[in-house]
């Protein structure tokens, strides 16, 4: 080795591996208003100190790698590195802790959920020094949220488009989810809308299969919408699923929906991807279409308590990427959802300013500034007996969606829709009169069923149906 090379190697650079905590654990750091803040639930491998594990998360999700590199000297690590600035224990879990990490805003591309997640929940989740890692929450600063367009329209604009106020909206997923012909599918849509529902919905896995191609489904559903509107005098909609194998095909389907004059389309935002979702949201905003979002695949990511990503993070990401509705659990139905946690991310979807509240799983105060809100959709195993609880839990700004709870009515689809509409109107009227829905809910439904034979039949069919399993996702 030449003397010249030896001299260079000795100036400002020392090859080798050093502990992450020496660079990325900074307990004295004061967070900035422009930082993206993350709360990670960390389960390190035995023998790995909490400070080292937290620093490793900050490093591997920002500027760090496993060894010191020459090119560190060509940038300012102090400006660009993520910092683990606080560590706190998890009650009842000796081997876990919450690591708080601050990321400088310049690490992220403007208006790109894809880029944000590629860093924060990228390779770090496969890091060997960690047994498990879960992203519990993010604080998105206004400086970053203002680079996103957000929901295509938002709650108030949707109500104005539909001319529906003062109550939750009612929906229904057409069942069986797969196997119907386009004409029979359209007939079911018509019967449900005529019976009193505001919306019907494609199931998430209805795209363009051999038994029902997308164009045929769109045509028959549009016919059902316009016929039911003419008969009822109400504005109706059907969530036409535009999800496809390519972004180009997805946009083509949305264009056809717009040409038909329908009010709303749908996207599976996790299986379709955030880039596709944001592209579709931009199209919907520019062309007057509402956008319904289904969260298929979310439980793969968010259901395990120790690893993955909490749904409140996915909900925040969706609000930035763009959607007017998103499925958010039911609390009372067949799908996962603990009450306080669910209400926490429902507020994150709808409200402008949400205070930190650890009792509901909210780790950071979130300020959305002027970004429109998203309507939470309660769907999955719900029926007329759940209507008082759903009305009380979710309030007016929500969509209550009954699939089997409409189409499973013993008299058919239209009577099933009538039963749900009567139950909802009864609950809203009782609430407006000052009655307690949580305490008097069953009595309110029984009273309404005395003058609605459709509701009485529904009450009889589902009087014994319960889904009583302990929620996996608890505080």
Curated annotation (Swiss-Prot):
Return the protein name. Answer: Ribulose bisphosphate carboxylase large chain
Species assigned in the record: Calycanthus floridus var. glaucus
According to the record, cofactor stoichiometry and binding are noted as: Binds 1 Mg(2+) ion per subunit.
Top-level class of the enzyme under EC nomenclature: lyase
**Entry GO CC:** chloroplast
Q: Where does substrate bind?
A: 123, 173, 177, 295, 327, 379
Record GO biological process: photorespiration; reductive pentose-phosphate cycle
Q: Name one Pfam family in it.
A: RuBisCO_large
Q: Which domain of life is it from?
A: Eukaryota
Residues annotated as carrying N-acetylproline in the record are: 3
Catalyses:
2 (2R)-3-phosphoglycerate + 2 H(+) = D-ribulose 1,5-bisphosphate + CO2 + H2O; D-ribulose 1,5-bisphosphate + O2 = 2-phosphoglycolate + (2R)-3-phosphoglycerate + 2 H(+)
Where, subcellularly, is it found? Plastid, Chloroplast
Regions annotated as coiled coil: none
Positions annotated as active site in the UniProt record: 175 (proton acceptor), 294 (proton acceptor)
Q: Extra info from the record?
A: The basic functional RuBisCO is composed of a large chain homodimer in a 'head-to-tail' conformation. In form I RuBisCO this homodimer is arranged in a barrel-like tetramer with the small subunits forming a tetrameric 'cap' on each end of the 'barrel'.
How is this chain modified after translation? The disulfide bond which can form in the large chain dimeric partners within the hexadecamer appears to be associated with oxidative stress and protein turnover.
Give the pro-peptide residues. 1-2
Role, per record = RuBisCO catalyzes two reactions: the carboxylation of D-ribulose 1,5-bisphosphate, the primary event in carbon dioxide fixation, as well as the oxidative fragmentation of the pentose substrate in the photorespiration process. Both reactions occur simultaneously and in competition at the same active site.
Q: GO molecular function: any one?
A: ribulose-bisphosphate carboxylase activity
> Which UniProt key words apply to this protein?
Acetylation, Calvin cycle, Carbon dioxide fixation, Chloroplast, Disulfide bond, Lyase, Magnesium, Metal-binding, Methylation, Monooxygenase, Oxidoreductase, Photorespiration, Photosynthesis, Plastid
Q: Where is this site: Transition state stabilizer?
A: 334
Task: List residues modified as N6,N6,N6-trimethyllysine.
Answer: 14
Cofactor(s) recorded for this entry are: Mg(2+)
């Amino acid at each position: 080795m030449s003397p010249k090379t030896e001299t260079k190697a000795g100036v400002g650079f020392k090859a080798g591996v050093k502990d992450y905590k020496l660079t990325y654990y900074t307990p004295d750091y004061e967070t900035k208003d422009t930082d993206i803040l993350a709360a990670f639930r960390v389960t390190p491998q035995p023998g790995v100190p909490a400070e080292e594990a937290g620093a490793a998360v900050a490093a591997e999700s920002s500027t760090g790698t496993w060894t010191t590199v020459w090119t560190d000297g060509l940038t300012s690590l102090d400006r660009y590195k993520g910092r683990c600035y606080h560590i706190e224990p998890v009650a009842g879990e000796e081997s876990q802790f919450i690591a708080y990490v601050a990321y400088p805003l310049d690490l992220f591309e403007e208006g790109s959920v894809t880029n944000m997640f590629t860093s924060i929940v990228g390779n770090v989740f496969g890091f060997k020094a960690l047994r498990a890692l879960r992203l519990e929450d993010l604080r998105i600063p206004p400086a970053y949220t203002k680079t996103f367009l957000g929901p295509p329209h938002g709650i108030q604009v949707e109500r104005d488009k539909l001319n529906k106020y003062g109550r939750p909206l009612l929906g229904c997923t057409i069942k069986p989810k797969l196997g119907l012909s386009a004409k029979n599918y359209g007939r079911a849509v018509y019967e449900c809308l005529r019976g009193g529902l505001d919306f019907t919905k494609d199931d998430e896995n209805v795209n363009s299969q051999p038994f029902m191609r997308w164009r045929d489904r769109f045509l028959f559903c549009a016919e059902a919408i316009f016929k039911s509107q003419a008969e009822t005098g109400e504005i109706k909609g059907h969530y036409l699923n535009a999800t496809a194998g390519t972004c180009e095909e997805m946009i083509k389907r949305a264009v056809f929906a717009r040409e038909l004059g329908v009010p709303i389309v749908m996207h599976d935002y996790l299986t379709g991807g955030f880039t596709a979702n944001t592209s579709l949201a931009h199209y919907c905003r520019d062309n007057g279409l509402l956008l319904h979002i289904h969260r298929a695949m979310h439980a793969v990511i968010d259901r395990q308590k120790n690893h993955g990503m909490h749904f409140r993070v996915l909900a925040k990401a969706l609000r930035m990427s763009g959607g007017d509705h998103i499925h958010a659990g039911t609390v009372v139905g067949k799908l996962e959802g603990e009450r306080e946690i669910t209400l926490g991310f429902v507020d994150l979807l709808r409200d402008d300013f949400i205070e930190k509240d650890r009792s509901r799983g909210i780790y950071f105060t979130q300020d959305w500034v002027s970004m429109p809100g998203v309507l939470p959709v309660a769907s999955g195993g719900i029926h007329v007996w759940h209507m008082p609880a759903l009305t009380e839990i979710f309030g007016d700004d929500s969509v209550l969606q009954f699939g089997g709870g409409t189409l499973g009515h013993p008299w058919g689809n239209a009577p099933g829709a009538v039963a749900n509409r009567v139950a909802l109107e009864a609950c809203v009227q009782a609430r407006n009169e000052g009655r307690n829905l949580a305490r008097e809910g069953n009595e309110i439904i029984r009273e309404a069923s005395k003058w609605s034979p459709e509701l009485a039949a529904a009450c009889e069919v589902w009087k014994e149906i319960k889904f009583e399993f302990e929620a996996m996702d608890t505080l």
